[in-house]
């Protein structure tokens, strides 16, 4: 039995609030159960040096966790003087995932930065950041069209992500902290709306896991992500 009493394939309740802040071109608060992540997408008319003059755009991301997003206060990384390895790994994952959603050639020499700030963490913060960040990215691209910066949105497809794992011997989808902290296997999966795989991060926490268990987790992830894409599109079509 899962601590949340959910079935193995069941996602946590999701809530998506668009236009959450006033200044960002795309702004989304995504809530996956008790995990809450603010995703702001900002448009810039410049690109990294390695892309200048090539007529191609870029999507990047930053990730941070508020000091009291967790049960015990964590020091701000700015106060430590550098970002931690976990933070760098996560924001690179978010950026890679979101770039798969966009035709970078059609974006022109523009850059979109998606800032993902965890307000409250209860497991699955990086996957929530990707799912919410893609909606914020879509809104930012639509803003560019409305402002005449693009003729049409270069968004190719929606991208979403979910965690899966083995908890008490059973593969389960969308782990919260109570499950994640006791899981035998912890896996993050990023997929396109058409089912294409972008990234699989799978780690055994307590001994090895089998090929069959991996396939079972990927099957759960596919179903979970399909449900998330439905919610993404529902949110984008809400106005």
From Swiss-Prot:
Residues given in the record as phosphate binding sites: 86, 124-126
CDD domains recorded: RNase_PH_bact
Enzyme kind, highest EC tier: transferase
Keyword RNA-binding assigned: yes
GO terms for biological process, alphabetical: rRNA catabolic process; rRNA processing; tRNA processing
Lineage top rank: taxon: Bacteria
GO molecular function, one term: 3'-5'-RNA exonuclease activity
Keyword tRNA processing: yes
EC number: 2.7.7.56
Pfam families noted in UniProt: RNase_PH, RNase_PH_C
UniProt cross-references to InterPro entries, sorted A to Z: ExoRNase_PH_dom1, ExoRNase_PH_dom2, ExoRNase_PH_dom2_sf, PNPase/RNase_PH_dom_sf, Ribosomal_Su5_D2-typ_SF, RNase_PH, RNase_PH_bac-type, RNase_PH_CS
Keyword tags: Nucleotidyltransferase, RNA-binding, rRNA processing, Transferase, tRNA processing, tRNA-binding
UniProt xrefs under Gene3D superfamilies: GHMP Kinase, N-terminal domain (3.30.230.70)
Catalyzed reaction equations: tRNA(n+1) + phosphate = tRNA(n) + a ribonucleoside 5'-diphosphate
Subunit note: Homohexameric ring arranged as a trimer of dimers.
Role according to the record: Phosphorolytic 3'-5' exoribonuclease that plays an important role in tRNA 3'-end maturation. Removes nucleotide residues following the 3'-CCA terminus of tRNAs; can also add nucleotides to the ends of RNA molecules by using nucleoside diphosphates as substrates, but this may not be physiologically important. Probably plays a role in initiation of 16S rRNA degradation (leading to ribosome degradation) during starvation.
Family assignment from sequence similarity: Belongs to the RNase PH family.
Name of the molecule in the record: Ribonuclease PH
Species, as recorded: Psychromonas ingrahamii (strain DSM 17664 / CCUG 51855 / 37)
Gene: rph
């Amino acid at each position: 039995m899962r601590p949340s009493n959910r079935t193995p394939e069941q996602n946590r309740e999701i809530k998506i609030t668009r236009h959450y802040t006033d200044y960002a071109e795309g702004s989304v608060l995504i809530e996956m159960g008790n995990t809450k992540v603010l995703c702001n997408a900002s448009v810039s008319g410049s690109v990294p040096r390695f892309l200048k003059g090539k007529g191609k755009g870029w999507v990047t991301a930053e990730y941070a966790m508020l000091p009291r997003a967790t049960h015990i206060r964590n020091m701000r990384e700015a106060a430590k003087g550098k970002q931690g390895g976990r933070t760098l790994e996560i924001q690179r994952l978010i950026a890679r995932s979101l770039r798969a959603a966009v035709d970078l050639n059609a974006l022109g020499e523009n850059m979109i930065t998606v800032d993902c700030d965890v307000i409250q963490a209860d497991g699955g913060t990086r996957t929530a950041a990707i799912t919410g960040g893609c909606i914020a990215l879509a809104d930012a691209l639509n803003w560019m069209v409305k402002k005449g910066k693009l003729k049409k949105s270069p968004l190719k497809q929606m991208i979403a992500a979910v965690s899966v794992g083995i908890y008490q011997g059973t593969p389960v989808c969308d782990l919260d902290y109570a499950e994640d902290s006791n899981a035998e296997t912890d896996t993050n999966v990023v997929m396109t709306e058409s089912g294409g795989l972008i990234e699989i991060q799978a780690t055994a926490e307590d001994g090895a896991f089998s090929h069959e268990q991996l396939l079972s987790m990927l099957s759960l992830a596919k179903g979970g992500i399909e449900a998330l894409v439905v919610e993404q599109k529902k949110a984008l079509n809400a106005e």
